[in-house]
Amino acid sequence: MLSCRLQCALAALSIVLALGGVTCAPSDPRLRQFLQKSLAAAAGKQELAKYFLAELLSEPNQTENDALEPEDLSQAAEQDEMRLELQRSANSNPAMAPRERKAGCKNFFWKTFTSC
């Protein structure tokens, strides 16, 4: 009987201490500022990581060019020039509208060819 009372008293005491510890938790403004700074730093690191990833993706050939020999560099430069010329020619001469096509042309419509 004595041990039952002792166990109940210890259980009640532990519950009171647990509730008291939770309600008396320090609400230190320095702790709150530290947590806010750490969250801001984590967000800043994510933005920094996104920036570096975008920078790496914007120039994927740079690391390849560093490892190439001078002959390969000239070949890569020629390929880049050809790519730029193709882009310029595609932009400067857009596809002709259907009304501007020549008189004898044929269009592929559905499964048959039709004349303009």
UniProtKB/Swiss-Prot annotation:
Record-level GO cellular component terms: cytosol; extracellular space; GABA-ergic synapse
Family: Belongs to the somatostatin family.
Modification(s) after translation: C-terminal amidation of the neuronostatin peptide is required for its biological activity, including for the regulation of mean arterial pressure.
Protein name in the entry: Somatostatin
Signal peptide start-end: 1-24
GO biological process, one term: regulation of postsynaptic membrane neurotransmitter receptor levels
Top-rank taxon: Eukaryota
Keywords: Amidation, Cleavage on pair of basic residues, Disulfide bond, Hormone, Secreted, Signal
Record lineage: Eukaryota, Metazoa, Chordata, Craniata, Vertebrata
Cystine residue pairs: C105-C116
Alanine amide modifications at: A43
Origin species: Canis lupus familiaris (Dog)
Major site of localization recorded for this protein: secreted
GO molecular function: hormone activity
Propeptide: 25-88
Subcellular location(s) per record: Secreted
UniProt-annotated stretches for the region Disordered: 62-99
